[in-house]
Regions:
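Conserved catalytic cores of very large enzyme subunits
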Residues: 1-226, 247, 252-426, 431-434
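Contiguous, well-ordered alpha-helical segments that form the cores/surfaces of helical PPI scaffolds
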Residues: 230-243, 264
Length: 441
């Protein structure tokens, strides 16, 4: 297993055919105390990271060296992301370090952030389950409408009074919208149940989906789907807070508390509908890379251009702090961490580095520690990765490529590429003289 992980990380650094950074499939490294993490190992690694990278430090935990390799890989290729199994909501009471099947009790994240773990109909596990569907709430629209309604109720224009009233209207709108979404998800679930097992031959016949192996091809999937999750999602938390308070939840404590309370309201609805229908409802910090732009276009058309709200091409995802806010990486992590505990349907915290991370991989490890300490469930570390399409150089490129000296739009003479070892005249005639291109290259 360790060999496979090492080779996977090595291949990720090498990239695709021409060194391109592979974006998918997403890789996730699990951080777990006693397995791939200890404070003692962290201190030793930070003290002399060059030795840690070279494998010259004997660590206490068996896989801390793989975490070091994962940090090195992230510093070059953006992945892997990091899953923190010691976050209180990610722990499993049956997990034991001496259990060879302990992976069954470890949470797994699908795709960008979807989390499937808690289960009303069986043991808490990610195995044999998935998300059935989710619907996302447009928080900025609810906030804009709340401010308009509050403004009509308080015509004297007292900003404090209007914002206070708008907050209450907004939270009630969140409750009503979440309730409507929960009913919509149930209606869709009832339709999904009528699908036949033969429509999912691989998943059902191989028992990939828990209980599917018991079904005959023409059986409806029915109760087999009850292990899946139904997500009440949301986007645009930052923009919604700007609509009410004139600033985001990174700089306004009142805005932060309002957004936190809004997600708490969603969780109350989730608990209500878990009891009502006996299904695995959850709150999801929606991965809305496409939907956020669509919502913004719709709202700009309806309400016009509102600074900080509808004046960009997209809404900020879920509870994320806007990357343009003047906060440090540590502050961003601390602001977002409490939301992970109340978005059990899935979440992620991104941080952005502005330098060339490959020259400072210890910074990745230090960020991992902050995420571990602050209770992040799932985190990702982004940084600039430029690639020259001609010579293949990967790193930060300014006006001139540091490898071949090319400027944007320019070509590079073949003679220069040959000197750099980046071009060889392989063809049907010359290949016999050079031997195998792969070996020589």
């Amino acid at each position: 297993g360790r060999m496979v992980i090492r080779e996977l990380l090595s291949a990720t650094i090498e990239g695709l055919g021409h060194g391109e950074v592979p974006v998918f499939p997403i890789q996730i490294f699990k951080v777990k105390e006693g397995v791939s993490w200890s404070e003692e190992d962290y201190a030793a690694a930070v003290k002399d990271f060059d030795k840690a990278l070279a494998g010259e430090i004997k660590f206490k935990t068996p896989n801390f060296d793989l975490l070091i390799e994962a940090c090195r890989t992230t510093s070059v290729a953006l992945f892997p992301n990091f899953m923190f199994l010691d976050a209180p909501f990610n722990r499993h009471e049956k997990w034991r370090i001496d259990d060879p099947d302990r992976f069954r009790y470890e949470v797994a994240t699908m795709g960008c952030r979807t989390r499937v773990f808690e289960n009303l109909h069986g043991e808490k596990s990610s195995w044999g389950r998935g998300n059935l569907s989710f619907t996302s709430m447009n928080l900025p629209r609810l906030a804009i409408e709340a401010m308009r309604e509050a403004g009509d109720m308080i015509p004297d224009g007292n900003k404090h009074a209007i914002r206070k009233e708008a907050r209450e209207i907004f939270l009630e709108s969140v409750r009503k919208t979440a309730t409507m979404m929960a009913e919509q998800l149930y209606e869709r679930y009832c339709f999904q149940r009528t699908a036949l097992a033969r429509q999912f031959p691989f998943m059902m016949s191989n028992d990939v989906w828990k209980g599917g192996g018991r079904l005959q091809p023409n059986d409806e999937v029915g109760d087999v789907l009850k292990h899946g999750t139904l997500g009440i999602g949301f986007i645009g938390g930052h923009n919604a807070m700007v609509a009410i308070y004139g600033e985001g939840h990174a700089t306004s404590k009142e805005a932060w508390q309002t957004l936190y309370d809004a997600v708490t309201v969603m969780n109350r609805v989730v608990e209500e509908y878990k009891a009502k229908y006996g299904l695995n409802y959850s709150v999801l910090a929606t991965p809305a890379e496409g939907l956020s732009g669509r919502f913004t276009r719709m709202d700009r058309k309806r309400y016009g251009e509102i600074p900080g709200v509808t004046d960009r091409d997209y809404y900020v995802n879920s509870f994320h702090v806007d990357v343009r806010e003047p906060v440090s990486i540590v502050e961003k992590i601390r602001l977002e961490a409490p939301f992970h505990a109340i978005t059990r349907g899935g979440h992620i915290t991104y941080v952005e580095l502005d330098g060339e991370a490959r020259k400072n991989p210890v910074a990745i490890l230090k960020i991992v520690k902050v995420m571990q300490d602050e209770g992040i469930g799932y985190g990702s570390i982004n940084h600039p990765v430029d690639r020259d399409p001609v010579c293949g150089y990967t790193g930060i490129i300014g006006e001139v490529c540091p490898r071949c000296g090319r400027r944007e739009g320019e070509g590079v003479p073949l003679s220069k590429l040959q000197k750099l070892g980046l071009y060889k005249n392989y063809n049907s005639t010359t290949i016999g003289y050079h031997g195998d291109p792969a070996e020589e290259a």
